[in-house]
């Protein structure tokens, strides 16, 4: 049986705990596979913009499955081959609910990630490395009003990264 395709996750698989460094052995393995004619795919929960650094470092990735499968991108021309975007009406409804609570969340849409200053400031308080946070901010687009994002893009997914304990029960209703 010949291997035709290799797909790898990013966080915790391709990169280490710092979310940034790709071990040399992984770079060599992916490039060796490419030399043998094997298709290389990154499959990640990240947006394409937040995965661009890893794709560039490897230099041998053919396709990216992004936002937990919401879109598949052909990296030859950056075109979306297939997608499963969230319903616009439902997305607006979700944002209206989110805005009632002090939630830390990201919007992934049109191959990019979007965050508020509030989300970024709260991420800085987490245990993520400062170097990653600096990189993260350059790859995410800041918004003032999430409705501007969801009304003008194709939303792939939301990441709710922090929910205060006092809000959990109310959100389940």
Give the role of each language-model region.
Residues 101, 108-173:
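Conserved acidic, metal-coordinating active-site core of Asp-based
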Residues 2-19, 94:
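Asp-based phosphoryl-transfer active-site loop
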Residues 11, 69, 163:
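Flexible loop residues that form catalytic
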């Amino acid at each position: 049986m010949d291997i035709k395709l290799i797909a790898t996750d990013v966080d915790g698989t391709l990169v280490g705990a710092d979310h940034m460094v790709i071990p040399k052995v992984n770079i060599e393995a992916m490039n060796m596979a490419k030399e043998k004619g094997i298709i290389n795919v990154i499959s990640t929960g990240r947006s394409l913009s937040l995965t661009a650094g890893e794709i560039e470092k490897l230099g041998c990735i053919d396709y990216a499955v992004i936002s937990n499968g919401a879109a598949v991108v052909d990296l030859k021309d950056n075109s979306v081959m297939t997608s499963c975007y969230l319903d616009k009406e439902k997305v607006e409804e979700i944002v209206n609910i989110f805005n009632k609570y002090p939630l830390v969340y990201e919007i992934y849409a049109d191959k990019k990630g979007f965050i508020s200053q509030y989300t970024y400031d709260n991420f800085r308080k987490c245990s993520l490395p400062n170097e990653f946070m600096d990189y993260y901010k350059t790859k995410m687009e800041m918004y003032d009003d999430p409705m501007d994002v969801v009304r003008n893009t194709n939303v792939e997914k939301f990441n709710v990264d922090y929910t205060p304990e006092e809000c959990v029960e109310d959100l389940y209703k």
